[in-house]
Amino acid sequence: MDRRRLPPDLPALLRQREAERAAAAKPRFIPKKERERMAAEKAAKEEEERKRREEALIAQRHSSANGTNGSNGYSSGKSTTNSIPTGPKAMRHPGDSGEPEHGGKRRRLNDNDEKRAEMERKDAAELRAKYMGPEVNQSTFSAKKKRKRTAANKFNFDWDPEDDTSRPFDPVYAERPESLVRLAGYENTDELVLRKAEAIRRGDPETGEERARKLLEQHERVKQAAERKNFGKHWSEKKLEDMKERDWRIFKENFGIATKGGAIPNPMRSWAESNLPRRLLEIVENVGYDEPTPIQRAAIPIAQQARDLIGVAVTGSGKTAAFLLPLLVYISELPPLTEFNKNDGPYALILAPTRELVQQIETEARKFAGPLGFTVVSIVGGHSLEEQAFALRNGAEIIVATPGRLVDCLERRLLVFSQCCYIIMDEADRMIDQGFEEPLTKILDALPVANEKPDTEDAENSQLMSRYLGGKDRYRQTMMYTATMPPLVEKIAKKYLRRPAIVTIGNAGEAVDTVEQRVEFVSGEDKRKRRLQEILNSGQFKPPVIVFVNIKRNCEMVAKDIKSWGYSTVTLHGSKTQEQREASLASVRNGQANILVATDLAGRGIDVADVSLVVNFNMPSSIEAYTHRIGRTGRAGKSGVAITFLGNEDSDVMYDLKQIISKSSISKVPEELRRHEAAQSKPTRGGGKKLDDSGGFAGKGGSWQ
């Protein structure tokens, strides 16, 4: 039985064709040897085809030449076409043969075949490069192009490589040239110019004489111009009358002095140029003040012109002498105290926030006021009112007081201000921080108003403000010294000061550059005690040393531990009586005690000489308190170190702490503080609660509370 042939499966056939098409379109990798073999076979075939075409062409030409006889030019055989008669062979032109077009067509066909073959070879090469990449060992370097390019841009020197092209010795250029322009602080000597002129004469025999003469003439003109303008000398080498505006600007920049206000005099360069009385200058020399500090250079000339003044300076900058010396000049021109006017009150009043600072100012003032015959009395808490009333029985030209106790004396009629005409507020920002704004306002309101300055431009006129009122009184002069300028301090200054001159030394609120600030992250009281013991036992720091804590209870506990380590220690905090405070400071100053453990009570204004180290056992809650704590060291131009223990509870002040350390040229921000999350941006909420030294256990006291 015959089987019938089944029809092809159409879907299968379509799938087969699709697979073949996909396989054909898919690039196939061919090994290099196979490619070389295929190329050789293709080249051989092409060569064989070319030879075959050439042989066929030659045979065709021979056959066409043998188709005519040699006698009459007629064909011996029959021809399928009629031949055209021709002349002799020598007279024929190319193409005049009986078959003129056949040879040309063959040549054109041959040329077309060659072009087609060349195009096919190029297409094949492009396909190979597209799917298999370029030949690995094929070089694209063209020696012909390279030779053309280098030959076209080649530069030929006028000498051979063996020639000596070094320049001969020239005495003019044998020495380093010096500028003939005379700059500030530098002076060109005549010897240098003469030596240069002589070198020009020796090096240039033809025109050297003329050039040297012009050089000397130019130098002489420059020297004469410099002498006329006095431009070439440093400000320290000039006389006072030769100082120009540019010199004063350089002077202020050198000492970091910035002033604001109208009709401000120039700073003083030395004590001799201060216009202070000779007797007072002798006292300054005896006390040991060799050179004035920046705040003294700027503030004393302003104060001598009877101007109100706001002095903003870092701690330890010599502010006390800056306001004491003009004060003594002022009251020395007033009538002396007698039996008739001694009960009218003092001539000058100095206010300070703490008892210790008051006593320090009193001690400093007596150095200058005692030889001049002036009396200085301090009024502070801790002493009975009877003692202070007894001290005032003979009157006093200068009173130094804390605001609280002075208000008590005013309310009990122990003191009046009928002739007070010179007011100084030292550490004004600290007085505001401690809540003395109301007592301070009461004191300033109790001053006489008859000699108050007008709030006009006349307050900037030194001649008008230096006049006497009614033959004996003078206009009241008010000064305020502070390390920072919070809004409440600005409010008081605006109310009680008249057109004040503002003197800023450095940047307000920054630590002095003589203090190296170190920060260590130490959490927990026990770890901090061990670290403090390591620091004290290292032997790197000589006494005295001050350790600051935040609360009074910590003060006693830390002092007890330090004593157990073998160090003589005293404490200073708000619960101490005045006698105990004075005894503690005296023992540290005379060397009986090596270490002082204190709260922020000793953070401002307390001057203990040669403090080598300050340790912040607890970081204060404000950066201002930190600044004043570390300001106890590095005073009077000496260097010091401040070490601060930080914990996570101090996150509110980490940003400000990082900023103030980064501004110091001798301090380095530790990596842990720099990368701490709280130090990246200023906290939006308010800082930590301010510590009240009279309180019990407020603040960050740790586990000892």
Curated annotation (Swiss-Prot):
Keyword Ligase: no
Residue positions binding ATP: 313-320
Location in the cell: Cytoplasm; Nucleus
GO cellular component, one term: cytoplasm
Helicase ATP-binding domain boundaries: 300-503
Protease in keyword set: no
Compositional bias segments (type: Gly residues): 696-705
CDD domains named in the record: DEADc_DDX23, SF2_C_DEAD
SUPFAM superfamilies: P-loop containing nucleoside triphosphate hydrolases (SSF52540)
Coarse class of the protein's main subcellular location: cytoplasm
Its biological purpose: ATP-dependent RNA helicase involved in mRNA splicing. May destabilize the U1/5'-splice site duplex to permit an effective competition for the 5'-splice site by the U6 snRNA, resulting in the switch between U1 and U6 at the 5'-splice site. May also act to unwind the U4/U6 base-pairing interaction in the U4/U6/U5 snRNP, facilitating the first covalent step of splicing.
Descriptive protein name: Pre-mRNA-splicing ATP-dependent RNA helicase PRP28
